[in-house]
Amino acid sequence: MIIENQNVGRILNGVVNAMNGWSLQQKRSFLLDKQGEQVGSKLFTLIDDPHIVAGLGSGLYDGDGFATRKRAMIENGVLNQFYIDWYRSRKLGVQPTTGGTSNLILPPGKRSIDEIMKDLGRGILINGFIGSNSNSNTGDFSVGITGTLFENGELTQPIAEMNIADNHLNFWNKLAKAANDPWMNSS
């Protein structure tokens, strides 16, 4: 299974929601006790960069007035930080990091999506999602997909009304490759 770059955010959203201070304070996060632990494969790195020129989420200050900085929220699969605003930091008894996301980056790989399709032989290229459900407590999610079946690197037939159901910890630990085509038109 390959997910096109502009659609990865739909799956990633469940992880990001579990990283916010509200979820942590309410004990409604499957990542609650996972800081410093492996939550994905070594290829799973999530960078929050508020200083990208013309980035949709760019800014010098966050919603609490703190100066922003680039952060590796997840690096090589290890959860480094949470999104904790000033209010939640006092409730949790920890230092604030930042209240929310800015520009999220999954670093690109070295190979094209076409090369990866050839390597896999047979699979589904997901190019859209239809609804989704993610449980921040458990990490379980399900999402409807649209896409195209590929065989030997060639797109063969469309696929619709199919579901993916998994757990975020399991899903992100199966990340095997990232293509070299980052999607820059989103925050």
Place the predicted regions along the sequence by residue.
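Active-site pocket-lining segments that scaffold enzyme catalytic pockets across diverse folds
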Residues: 2-35
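Dual-mode signal for accessory low-complexity, basic/Gly-rich regions
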Residues: 18-19, 34-187
